[in-house]
Amino acid sequence: HMVRAGEHYASVKWLQQGFINAYGSQEKGATARNMFGQKDGTVNPRSEEDFAAQVWIDKGPQWANGGTAMVVRRIRMNVDTWEKLDRSSRENAIGRKLDTGAPLTGEDEFDAVDFDAVDDYGLPVIDKNSHMAVAAPPADHPEQRILRRPYNYELAPDGKDGQLSNIGQVFICYQQDPTQQFEPIQARLDESDLMNEWLTHIGSAMYFCPPGTLAADGRESWWAKSLCEHAGL
C-alpha cells in the first residue's frame, strides 16, 4: 500500500520479502518464531513507558522528535547444520527452552532470568555465551534494549555454499540511538554469541523513521513534514 501511495514521490530502492505467523494463527501479542523454531522477540518493550524510554527519540533536532532509528540486517541461517543438533544443544545455544521460550531457569516465557543458577555439577544452567546471556543489558547499562521486529525469509538454494536451504531472517530493530543501544549489543554478540556458529550477516543498513502524523497540534500534518522542511524540500 505504501509503495502505491508514494509512486509519484519515491521509488523502491531495495526489497526483501519476509513473513511471520499468519494473522489469527496465534493469540494477539504472542511472540513469533524464527526459522530455528525459537521464539524471537521475548525481551521487547511492552508498555508506553518502555517505548518512550527505548524507542521514540526525545532528544536532538526537533525534526527527529517522536521518530525512531531503524536498523535492518539480513542474516542467513544455517538450518542444515542446526537441525543436526539435539534439543539440549539448541536450547543451550539460545539460553531458552524451545517449546515455551522460557529461560532455562524458568517455566514461563517471561519468567525472570537467573544467570547465577548452577546445576548439580556446579556448572551454569544458562551458558554465559548463550545468545540470551550475551544480548542482555549489563547492570550498568540498562539503556541497551531495543524493539525487535524480525521477519523470516526462504529463497531457492543458490548453491554458493553447499547448503540445501537458503533461509534466514530480515532482522529489524528500532531504538532511540543505535550507537548507544544496538551497536554495543551487536559488538558483544559478534565477540562470543554461541549462535554465531549458525548465523552469517550478509547485509546491513540504518534508517531514520519520521514520526506519524499529528494533525491535532499541526506539527506533523503530513508524514515527514518536519524532516522535509529541515532539508529544504
What are these regions (language model features)?
Residues 1-233:
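Long, histidine/aromatic-enriched segments associated with O2/redox biology
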